[in-house]
């Protein structure tokens, strides 16, 4: 515990020195040498000892940075649980600076951006929905990045499908992602409903009807079955 505290204290001192005008890199290096007890090694043993100490310093800093990234992710999920989507979005963005290849973080960015689009009002009365649209495009980009990292990531596939169908009004784009999600999680009723809607909105009525039939066959809930039957009737009426 004391070692961890010392790591963060050392980092804080280094950042403070860098932020002060007129402080050179030589000053920072001199402080580091004092901390490690290394000055100007010349012999083989002194050089080996200096290398070992600085390797340990690098490992300590990497450990500290890794932990900071994890804490930002946890902070983001806490904000998300409390429906503080703007703060959650900021925390996940910070976490991505430490873990830029983490598909879960991109997924959470997509979720938060989607929620923030609902709160994006035209406060300047400009007559445009630019802020809302920007959040929606951020959500799209985040989901796509998550899928690029893990192409079988069902939650991201589903989230992107919902975005295309209900927010961006691009149901044709949703279909391949939702179909892939269904091929992985074959009994996910939520995905089935969104895919059926995507087919309907794309005028693929036969596929929409077939998907509602699949929901009716799969579900054990009377309410879910009733909803699927009602939606199926709407599609049948539209197909004639």
Which residues make up each language-model segment?
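N-terminal leader/linker segments that initiate helical-solenoid repeat arrays
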Residues: 19-78, 82
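Structural signature of tandem alpha-helical TPR/SEL1-like repeats
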Residues: 48-55, 82-91, 118-144, 168-180, ...
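Terminal, low-structured helical/coil segments at or just beyond the last alpha-helical repeat
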Residues: 60, 201-240
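Helix-start (N-cap) detector for alpha-helical repeat units in TPR-like alpha-solenoids
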Residues: 69, 103-104, 154-155, 189-190, ...
């Amino acid at each position: 515990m004391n070692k961890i505290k010392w790591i963060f204290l050392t980092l804080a001192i280094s950042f403070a020195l860098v932020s002060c005008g007129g402080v050179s890199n030589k000053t920072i290096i001199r402080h580091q040498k004092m901390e490690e007890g290394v000055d100007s090694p010349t012999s083989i043993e002194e050089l080996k000892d200096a290398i070992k100490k600085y390797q340990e310093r690098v490992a300590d800093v990497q450990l500290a940075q890794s932990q900071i990234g994890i804490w930002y992710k946890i902070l983001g999920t806490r904000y998300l649980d409390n429906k503080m989507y703007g703060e959650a979005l900021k925390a996940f963005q910070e976490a991505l600076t430490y873990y830029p290849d983490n598909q879960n973080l991109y997924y959470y960015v997509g979720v938060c951006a989607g929620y923030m689009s609902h709160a994006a009002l035209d406060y300047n009365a400009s007559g445009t929905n630019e802020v809302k649209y920007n959040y929606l495009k951020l959500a799209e980009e985040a989901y796509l990045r998550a899928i690029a990292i893990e192409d079988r990531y069902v939650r991201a596939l589903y989230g992107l499908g919902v975005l295309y169908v209900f927010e961006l009004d691009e149901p044709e784009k949703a279909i391949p992602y939702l179909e892939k999600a269904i091929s992985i999680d074959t009994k996910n009723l939520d995905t089935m409903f969104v895919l059926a809607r995507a087919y309907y909105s794309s005028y693929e009525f036969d596929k929409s009807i077939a998907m509602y039939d699949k929901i009716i066959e799969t579900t054990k809930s009377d309410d879910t079955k009733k909803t699927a039957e009602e939606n199926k009737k709407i599609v049948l009426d539209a197909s004639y």
